[in-house]
Amino acid sequence: MLFTGDQCYEEEEWLLETGAQVVSDILKIGHHGGNRSTSARFLDAVRPKVAVTTTPAWVATMPMPAEVTAMLQARRIPYFRSWEYGTLTICSDGKRFRIVLK
């Protein structure tokens, strides 16, 4: 799982330029799924099987930017927002993973 925290476009570009291995099955979308995070280039480099957004209550009423959801949908990457599903638990045996919604 790749945790991006409050990472925005500039940090994504820096990370890619360093040659860091960013491929991950699960991507925690940067900056709570807000503007200026998760560029197409970064998403293509990570190649996640699923994306997760942790969204505090004060942001919950704002939709994730259309461009982010469009990129995820175009790549057929399922995404989960904590405010929609509540607690998101990711279970793994080191080879496979599953997301438990509560």
Located regions from the model:
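Active-site-proximal loop/helix segments of hydrolase catalytic cores
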Residues: 1-64
